[in-house]
């Protein structure tokens, strides 16, 4: 085979590959377009069945949520403080108990 025939065969092969790629691309685009239309119809159907909230209402919910989050943070801080305070009081009570036992021992020793 000479160079000219090889180039012609190569060009034909490239043409067939390009046709195949074009056909697969067209199928993919067609399927994507069909899916997009079906999804749009489904969205319209769902929007009719389940109404969405207005932007103002959603903003009110966000503000309410933010307020509750702030209150929750404040409560968590207070709970942490009270837990620490309770722990400190328990330690203080233990120290008092130890001191009271020492005082009792000392007074018992002094009496005897």
Swiss-Prot record:
Give the location in the cell.
Endosome
GO CC term, one of those recorded = endosome
Put simply, this protein is called Biogenesis of lysosome-related organelles complex 1 subunit BLI1
Q: How does it assemble?
A: Component of the biogenesis of lysosome-related organelles complex-1 (BLOC-1).
Q: Looking at the record's lineage, which domain of life comes first?
A: Eukaryota
Q: Does the keyword Lipoprotein apply?
A: no
UniProt keyword Coiled coil present: yes
Tell me which species this is from. Eremothecium gossypii (strain ATCC 10895 / CBS 109.51 / FGSC 9923 / NRRL Y-1056) (Yeast)
Which portions of this protein are annotated as coiled-coil regions? 55-105
Q: Which UniProt keywords apply?
A: Coiled coil, Endosome, Transport
Q: What is this protein's function? A: Component of the biogenesis of lysosome-related organelles complex-1 (BLOC-1) involved in endosomal cargo sorting.
Q: Which family does it belong to?
A: Belongs to the BLI1 family.
């Amino acid at each position: 085979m000479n160079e000219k025939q090889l180039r012609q065969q190569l060009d034909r092969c490239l043409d067939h590959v390009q046709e195949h790629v074009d056909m697969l691309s067209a199928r993919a685009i067609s399927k994507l377009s069909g899916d997009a239309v079906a999804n749009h119809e489904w969205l319209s159907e769902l929007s009719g069945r389940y109404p969405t909230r207005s932007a103002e209402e959603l903003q009110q919910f966000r503000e309410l949520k933010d307020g509750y989050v702030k209150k929750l943070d404040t409560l968590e801080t207070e709970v942490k403080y009270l837990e620490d305070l309770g722990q400190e009081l328990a330690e203080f009570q233990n120290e008092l108990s130890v001191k009271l036992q020492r005082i009792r021992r000392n007074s018992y020793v002094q009496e005897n």
